[in-house]
Curated annotation (Swiss-Prot):
Subunit structure: Monomer. Component of the counting factor (CF) complex, which includes cf60, cf50, cf45-1 and ctnA.
Protein name, UniProt field: Counting factor 45-1
Glycosylation sites: 166
InterPro entries linked: GH25_Enzymes, Glyco_hydro_25, Glycoside_hydrolase_SF
PROSITE patterns for the chain: GLYCOSYL_HYDROL_F25_2
Region (Disordered): 231-297
UniProt similarity note: Belongs to the glycosyl hydrolase 25 family.
Zinc listed as a keyword: no
GO molecular function terms listed in the Swiss-Prot or TrEMBL record: lysozyme activity
Signal sequence coordinates: 1-20
Length: 297
């Protein structure tokens, strides 16, 4: 009996180590649909979750407080939030006001969280010129820092340059998207942008399904994480990039476009609260792209 118990404990520890650096993320639509039993199931294979708290013109995610409580009750140790803001979206400018509103609402709702990630990616009708976009993102990051929030940036090598040009030196953590289904930081050419030389987290697969919940898969830290089944069409030899978390314009169209600096561009798709986002891509192979989506207007 003692041997059996010891063997069981070893197996449980092994499972915990395999998933020690696994994380999932999902958009505001999914936030409002995850049940307590879903959370219990998700907690068995993930130590971290990132949920969308703000979605452009659609604003604050109303169910975020109960979702965070559900994740905490299930035993997920690290809970992050992400916000998609855009300077052409209603109620988002100046970004300092939007960030102040988000942080204030979270405090009023009694929400405790580890980090707030600023989602930087393209969507139709969401952005102005590169200079204005860069100033908008920098203001958002600096405002969060001034409020004492642990803040980082989510983007990809392609989305970053398309959205904010050569903006660099923000000095915050990077969560990058590269859909190569490889939970590691071995793909340095895909996170060396914006002045970053090392990342905190990688979104390595999208459009996956865990416990009946639509999620994107992420890796963080320096431990191990078994690759989950996500999807992302396109990209050859793992050399494309994209970003996800999704956004849509005020007219209800959305985009989570994948782009590359290498031999191909990845594609992914994501649903938004008013439409579906998709990233375009070329070439074939097992791939890397990105795309979950959530709406912004």
């Amino acid at each position: 009996m003692n041997k059996l118990i010891s063997l069981l404990l070893v197996c449980l520890v092994a499972i915990a180590l395999v998933n020690a650096d696994c994380a999932i993320d999902f958009d505001s639509d999914t936030v409002n649909s995850v049940t307590s039993s879903d959370w219990s199931c998700l907690a068995a294979s993930n130590d971290r979750v990132i949920m969308q708290v703000f979605s452009g013109g659609y604003g604050y995610t109303s169910g975020i407080a109960s979702a965070v409580q559900g994740a905490q009750a299930a035993g997920i140790s690290t809970i992050d939030l992400y916000a998609f803001l855009c300077n052409q979206c209603s109620g988002n400018s100046p970004s300092s006001s939007a960030i102040q509103s988000i942080v204030s609402q979270l405090q009023n709702d009694g929400v405790s969280y580890n980090m707030l990630w600023i989602d930087v990616e393209q969507c139709d009708g969401c952005w102005g010129d590169l200079g204005d976009n860069a100033a908008f993102v920098q203001e958002a990051v600096e405002t969060a820092q001034n409020l004492g929030v642990n803040v980082g940036v989510y983007s990809s090598i392609g989305e970053w340059s398309q959205t904010v040009g050569n903006l660099s030196g923000l000095g915050v953590d990077l969560w990058y998207a590269h859909y190569d289904n490889n939970p590691s930081f071995s793909d340095s050419s895909f996170y060396e942008f914006g002045g970053w030389t090392s990342p905190t987290m990688k979104q390595y697969a999208g459009n996956g399904n865990e416990c009946g919940v639509s999620v994107d898969m992420n890796f963080f830290g320096s431990g191990t994480c078994s690759a989950s089944t996500g999807s992302g069409s396109g990209s050859s030899s793992g050399s494309s990039s994209g970003s996800s978390s999704g956004s849509s314009s005020g007219s209800g169209s959305s985009s989570g476009s994948g782009s590359s600096s290498g031999s191909s561009s990845g594609s992914g798709s994501g649903s938004s609260s008013s439409g579906s986002g998709s990233g375009s891509g070329s070439s074939s192979g097992s791939g890397s792209s990105s795309g979950s989506g959530s709406g912004s207007s």
